[in-house]
Design a protein with these regions (language model features):
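N-terminal non-catalytic structural scaffold regions of very large proteins
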Residues: 2-208
Length: 208
């Protein structure tokens, strides 16, 4: 009679969810499948500070509980997104705001945040080319649900591509201007039931 039953739990499908947080921040929360190097991350758009309206940042978790904020513009460029594509999706003003907010060390900071989570004294900073390749490889190794992405961004991405990040950022711009609706993270269509066998499988296959 000491047997315990592990009930299933609903888990958010891997994908991008665009909505206002409880503190008023407008975010794209990217829920990534277990086992990816990047882990879950966010894209933030500034809409309160009048001097920084429209500036976007990629927010990734580093080794401890802290997060690292990285300007989105150099991330998109490294992922193969052109300036003209950003102009078309963001509009001229927001495109220029993000180009201006770019920092030359952005990709190196992404590399350090992900690759040095254990705070090793042996960490070696990458070259610019290495940092850009690391960014591409890291996102390419992150899986998302094609169904969720189709619902959220209109295209069934299975990996995180430059286009997926561009469309996600563009959706934030649209929401910030009141032209696009937020996503409903609580919708059951964005969740799946996760049972005991799923936890075991995840542990065995992902090394979680």
């Amino acid at each position: 009679g000491g047997e315990r039953q592990l009930d299933g739990v609903f888990r958010l499908n891997p994908g991008a969810y665009h909505a206002e947080a409880n503190n008023g921040d407008l975010l794209a929360k990217w829920n990534v499948a277990a086992g990816s190097k990047v882990g879950s991350f966010k894209i933030y758009i500034e809409r309160r500070n009048p001097k920084k309206i429209g500036e976007m940042e990629l927010i990734v978790k580093s080794g401890d509980a802290s997060s690292v904020k990285i300007p989105l513009y150099p991330v998109l460029r490294a992922m193969g997104v052109s300036d003209s594509e950003m102009q078309a999706k963001f509009g001229e003003d927001i495109y220029k705001a993000n180009q201006k907010a770019s920092r030359p060390n952005a990709l190196a900071r992404f590399h350090k945040a992900i690759e040095n989570r254990k705070r090793s004294t042996k960490y070696a900073p990458p070259t610019s080319a290495e940092a850009a390749q690391f960014l591409r490889d890291t996102f390419d190794g992150a899986e998302v649900s094609a169904e969720t992405m189709k619902s959220s961004l209109g295209k069934g991405f299975e990996k995180i591509t430059g286009e997926a990040l561009l469309l996600s950022a563009a959706k934030l711009v649209g929401i910030s201007k009141g032209k696009v609706k937020e996503d409903d993270r609580q919708s059951l269509s964005n969740k799946r039931l996760f049972g005991a066998e799923d936890f075991v499988y995840e542990h065995l296959t992902k090394g979680a």
